[in-house]
């Protein structure tokens, strides 16, 4: 306890800097904007868009909005060793990002500046904000289990790597952090996920672990293997000082009850982080508020596209100051990793503006709008939570898609759900979920009216490990890979249904 209180004092000045967000948000973002533009002015990209003469945000709007395919050619040249393309100098690290939404991998540049002023800054701030929220913390009395992916050489260029962002972070981590981190770097960077889980379980059982960091679905696999090996019922029997899980990558709602059952300690906390291959953007600053604080003084300049504009060839794009509370936006970023006005694919919804706090509401491509219902991932998560509460169920994984018209000319949503605990009544679960979605989403309610457009949703129970096997078939176990929750077409769900035998 003493060590945590002493070390915690080192975070006080940073906590005060973060407090400035509430009153100085626009000024902070203006400073970031100018820094990024000035630093990149002499790059090939900066010359193309005449960054040297950009003075205002209005000037900056001449830079076109980018998606990955728009910058892929530049990134490919950078991966072959070319310098001063999107960011000064040579970028040698590339975060491989695909999720499961696209078979083509994306290789996101991760510059030294980006590592320092975005990714590692986010990790440090997570601890700073956690210690403020939990002054009784014993965080530094033990070690942190950080679950990451793997990396491999990039075109055999010296010291150049491509892989999961988490692996790049572990590879380049401050050596001092290795004294308070498990597992070893060798184990953490293993490419075979199932072997990694086994080795982590073997080597961490006798450690004093106080904190966990990783993607909830993959961390769950580690926890379950540790419990299997030890015969323990609860993780706090093995790690009695465990107190916080820093989680990100997927929504935690479907996993919360499982974690509560596996970690029964009343001192256990869960803190959401918004870290992606493209950057680190948000942190839960209050453990009692699910919304995250938008991190304003990293090397990230934010813009937003109203979701209804996302398919417009020339969408309306607004700065942070113009966002409205409760509205869905696609996030657009410019960063010191060389991403410029880049659409990252996530949608966010602000809950307040002083300071700016938000929730991740879904993905620009992960929603169902086949019939005008605009069902977002956050709608789905809330609906499932209600259905689980009403029927005693626990959902492990799920994916949903529209049925456009079956033999009886009926349209509906089809949900493929893997339960860790079955509902006491599947029919009641189905009714409750459908009713909850109508309560949450007025567009879905309108389309469900008298079953005219949409019939009541359908649930198919997935066999155990279906989603694990689907990801494995695609070579996407571990790291930051995830199951697509909602899709506007049937491509993914048809693949999954073929495996559901």
What role is predicted for each listed range?
Residues 1-52, 59-66, 74-81, 166-501:
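Active-site glycine/GP-rich loop and adjacent strand/helix microenvironment
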Residues 27, 31-35, 39-94, 105-110, ...:
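Active-site diphosphate/adenylate-binding microenvironment
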Residues 83-84, 103-114, 237, 244, ...:
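Non-catalytic, beta-rich accessory domains that mediate macromolecular interactions or localization
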Residues 95-101:
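Conserved helicase ATPase motor motifs in RecA-like P-loop NTPase domains
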Residues 104, 140-142, 241-242, 268:
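Short coil/turn connectors at secondary-structure junctions
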Residues 104, 114-118, 262-269:
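Short, charged helix-to-loop "capping" segments that act as catalytic/coupling loops
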Residues 122-127, 288:
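Short, basic alpha-helical nucleic acid-contact segments in DNA-binding proteins
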Residues 129-175:
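Conserved AMP-binding loop of ANL adenylate-forming enzymes
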């Amino acid at each position: 306890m003493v060590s945590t209180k002493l070390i915690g004092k080192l975070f006080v000045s940073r906590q005060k800097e973060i407090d400035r967000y509430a009153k100085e948000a626009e000024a902070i973002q203006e400073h970031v904007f100018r820094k990024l533009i000035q630093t990149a002015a002499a790059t090939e990209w900066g010359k193309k868009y005449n960054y040297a003469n950009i003075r205002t945000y209005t000037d900056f709007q001449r830079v076109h909005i980018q998606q990955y395919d728009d910058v892929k050619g530049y990134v490919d040249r950078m991966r072959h060793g070319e310098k001063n393309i999107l960011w000064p100098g040579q970028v040698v690290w590339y975060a491989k990002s695909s999720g499961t939404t696209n078979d083509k991998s994306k290789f996101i540049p991760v510059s030294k500046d980006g590592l320092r002023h975005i990714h590692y800054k986010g990790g440090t701030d997570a601890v700073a904000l956690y210690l403020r929220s939990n002054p009784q913390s014993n965080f530094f009395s033990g070690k942190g289990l950080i679950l990451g992916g793997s990396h491999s050489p990039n075109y055999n260029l010296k010291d150049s790597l491509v892989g999961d962002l988490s692996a790049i972070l572990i590879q380049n981590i401050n050596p001092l952090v290795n004294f308070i981190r498990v597992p070893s770097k060798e184990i953490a960077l293993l490419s075979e996920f199932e072997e990694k889980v086994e080795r982590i379980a073997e080597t961490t059982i006798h450690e004093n672990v106080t904190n966990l960091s990783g993607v909830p679905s993959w961390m769950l696999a580690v926890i379950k293997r540790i419990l299997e090996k030890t015969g323990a019922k609860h993780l706090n029997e093995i790690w009695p000082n465990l107190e916080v899980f820093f989680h990100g990558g997927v929504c935690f709602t479907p996993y919360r009850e499982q974690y509560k059952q596996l970690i029964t300690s009343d001192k256990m906390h869960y803190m959401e982080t918004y870290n992606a291959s493209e950057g680190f953007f948000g942190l839960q600053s209050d453990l009692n508020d699910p919304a995250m604080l938008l991190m304003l003084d990293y090397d990230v300049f934010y813009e937003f596209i109203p979701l209804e504009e996302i398919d417009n060839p020339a969408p309306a794009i607004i700065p942070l100051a113009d966002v409205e509370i409760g509205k869905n936006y696609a996030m657009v970023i410019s960063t010191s990793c060389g991403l410029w006005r880049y659409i990252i694919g996530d949608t966010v919804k602000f809950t307040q503006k002083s300071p700016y706090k938000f929730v991740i509401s879904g993905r620009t491509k992960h929603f169902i709008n086949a019939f005008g219902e605009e069902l977002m991932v956050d709608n789905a998560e809330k609906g499932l939570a209600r259905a689980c509460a009403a029927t005693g169920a626990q959902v492990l994984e799920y994916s949903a898609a529209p049925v456009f018209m079956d033999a009886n000319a009926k349209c509906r949503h089809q949900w493929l759900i893997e339960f860790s605990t079955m509902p006491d009544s599947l029919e009641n679960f189905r009714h409750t979920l459908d009713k909850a979605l109508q309560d949450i989403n007025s567009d879905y309610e309108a389309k469900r009216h008298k079953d005219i457009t949409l019939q009541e949703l359908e649930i198919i129970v997935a066999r155990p490990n279906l989603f694990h096997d689907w990801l494995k078939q695609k070579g996407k176990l571990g790291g930051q890979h995830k199951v697509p929750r909602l899709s506007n077409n049937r491509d993914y769900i048809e693949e999954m249904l073929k495996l559901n035998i």
